[in-house]
Amino acid sequence: VNSTNKLTPSSLREAFGHFPTGVVAIAAEVDGVRQGLAASTFVPVSLEPPLVSFCVQNTSTTWPKLTGVPMLGISVLGEAHDAAVRTLAAKTGDRFAGLETVSNDAGAVFIKGTSVWLESAIEQLVPAGDHTIVVLRVNQVKVDPNVAPIVFHRSVLRRLGV
């Protein structure tokens, strides 16, 4: 470590950004309209029962729309979705512009061409500072091993080196 920064939200954001993560889309149909958000805080939690989690900012205006649906679709984004990540993370506009999606009977929305689809239901919400940890129970999974991942590192989307 070369230097010590004063502990501030921006210094923490910079420090946390040094940890590379994947990016997922969390989406569902709400009253016939696709709603969704991007998250780089996705984490597998448990195999038995099958649980995953992600964190969402308490100030999110999209998350309250998703909390009442029976099922959420989680799509693990790949290299082809670098532009989509910014669109999904936008504060305004159509977050699904230019994206092909599929909805299932439970209302979960998935993005085509991603490496993993997880149909999930909210299991638990855990308050954690300025975020909420969302624990989801996985009901169905679909995997495409041929889709290369995208990595979010230091606020830049990168491809995984081979």
Regions found by a protein language model. Give the residues of each.
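Basic, polyanion-binding surface patches
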Residues: V1-V162
